[in-house]
């Protein structure tokens, strides 16, 4: 009996240790306003559960997110962190999309130093296989996927106009004679593996105030700021929709872990088949896959915890307590 008791005690301690480690790592996303983007965050939370991620989802929200939407996210097991907006200097040239200006507020996530490492995912992303292993990447770097210059949002850039894309640089040679040196490697900021750090956070806020805003807002800024420590990772971790019709030879959807529904009309909760390329069968299939996850009630936080508790009571109890505790702690606003 004594030996059995000791074995159980060791098992409990092991589970407690795992739970303790979990709070040092988390996924994080960003939400602003009172529109329907909360649906994307709910879909992401349920997608992470479906692939059995071991880590929670933190939602950095601006004060203008309605209480109703906050309660929906809490009910889905999300950890809410209210943050204050970050406003860059005035932009006299304009952004690719007018709403991009609010995305500078994402810089606040570097302040979340209760976590040693985080994976940022935009709210229009879905995870179709477990990517927890990215938390084990070597420290000291920022990891992200190289962007595709073939999206329509790049239409005003030289890259788009000449058909050059860093995803397939061999297709179109960069004309050094007329355009000078090719552009540096450039990542899509919809998915980032990063390490929160107060010194970095304070410097980000300082530098952004003396940096002239450019076309892609915070994405341009982050690319410039982290150019020395950026490490590319495969596009399977952030497949932007344009890759499907621009570089199909490089895509095997069965091997893709993360889909970024960023093309015009592609967001599943407001899907518009009349937009260019949205009548493609592969796009419709990916939209359906998102809805299958969103509408799966077994992936709702309450139902998921109840199911897991039957399979592993100790882990389920720890996970439930961990989320509740973090929610209570993290309701205080975060601001510099």
UniProtKB/Swiss-Prot annotation:
GO terms for biological process: galactose metabolic process. Its cofactor is a divalent metal cation. GO terms for molecular function: inositol 3-alpha-galactosyltransferase activity; metal ion binding. Coiled coil: none annotated. Its EC number is 2.4.1.123. The active site is at 106. GO terms for cellular component: cytoplasm. It is found in: Cytoplasm. It catalyses: myo-inositol + UDP-alpha-D-galactose = alpha-D-galactosyl-(1->3)-1D-myo-inositol + UDP + H(+). Mn(2+) binds at residues 122, 124, 260. Keywords: Carbohydrate metabolism, Cytoplasm, Galactose metabolism, Glycosyltransferase, Manganese, Metal-binding, Transferase. Galactinol synthase involved in the biosynthesis of raffinose family oligosaccharides (RFOs) that function as osmoprotectants. May promote plant stress tolerance. This is Galactinol synthase 6.
């Amino acid at each position: 009996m004594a030996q059995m008791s000791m074995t159980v005690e060791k098992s409990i301690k092991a589970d407690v240790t795992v739970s303790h480690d979990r709070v040092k790592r988390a996924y994080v996303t960003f939400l602003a306003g009172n529109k329907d983007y909360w649906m994307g965050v709910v879909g992401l939370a349920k997608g992470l559960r479906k692939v059995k991620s071991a880590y929670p989802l933190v939602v950095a929200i601006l004060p203008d997110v309605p209480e109703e939407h906050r309660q929906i996210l809490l009910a889905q097991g999300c950890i809410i962190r209210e943050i204050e907006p970050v406003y860059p200097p005035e932009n006299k040239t304009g952004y690719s999309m007018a709403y991009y200006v609010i995305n500078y507020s994402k810089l606040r996530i570097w302040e979340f130093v209760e976590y040693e490492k985080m994976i940022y995912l935009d709210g229009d992303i879905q995870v179709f296989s477990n990517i927890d292993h990215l938390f084990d990447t070597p420290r000291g770097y920022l990891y992200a996927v190289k962007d595709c210059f073939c999206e329509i949002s790049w239409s005003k850039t030289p890259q788009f106009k000449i058909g050059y894309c860093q995803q397939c640089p061999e297709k179109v040679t960069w004309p050094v004679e007329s355009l000078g040196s090719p552009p540096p490697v450039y990542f899509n900021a919809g998915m980032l593996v990063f390490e929160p750090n107060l010194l970095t956070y304070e410097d980000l806020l300082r530098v952004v105030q003396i940096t002239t805003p450019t076309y892609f807002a915070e994405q341009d800024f982050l690319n410039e700021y982290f150019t020395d420590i950026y490490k590319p990772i495969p596009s399977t971790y952030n497949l932007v929709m344009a890759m499907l019709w621009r570089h199909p030879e490089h895509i095997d959807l069965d091997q893709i872990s993360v889909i970024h529904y960023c093309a015009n009309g592609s967001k599943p909760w407001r899907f518009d088949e009349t937009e260019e390329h949205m009548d493609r069968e592969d796009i419709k299939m990916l939209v359906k896959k998102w809805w299958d996850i969103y509408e799966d009630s077994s992936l709702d936080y309450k139902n998921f915890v109840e199911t897991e508790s039957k399979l592993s009571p100790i882990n389920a109890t720890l996970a439930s307590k961990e989320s509740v505790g973090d929610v209570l702690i993290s309701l205080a606003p975060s601001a510099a």
